């Protein structure tokens, strides 16, 4: 699984 944060 990949996690990311949109800035």
Curated annotation (Swiss-Prot):
Transmembrane segments: none
Domain of life where this protein originates: Eukaryota
Keywords per UniProt: Amidation, Neuropeptide, Secreted
Disulfide bond annotation, renumbered to this chain: none
Coiled coil spans: none
GO cellular component, one term: extracellular region
Leucine amide PTM positions: 7
Subcellular compartments: Secreted
Any one of the GO BP annotations: neuropeptide signaling pathway
Protein family per UniProt: Belongs to the FARP (FMRF amide related peptide) family.
Function recorded in the entry: FMRFamides and FMRFamide-like peptides are neuropeptides.
Protein name, per record: Extended FMRFamide-1
Organism: Tyrannophasma gladiator (Gladiator)
Source lineage: Eukaryota, Metazoa, Ecdysozoa, Arthropoda, Hexapoda
């Amino acid at each position: 699984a990949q996690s990311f944060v949109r800035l």
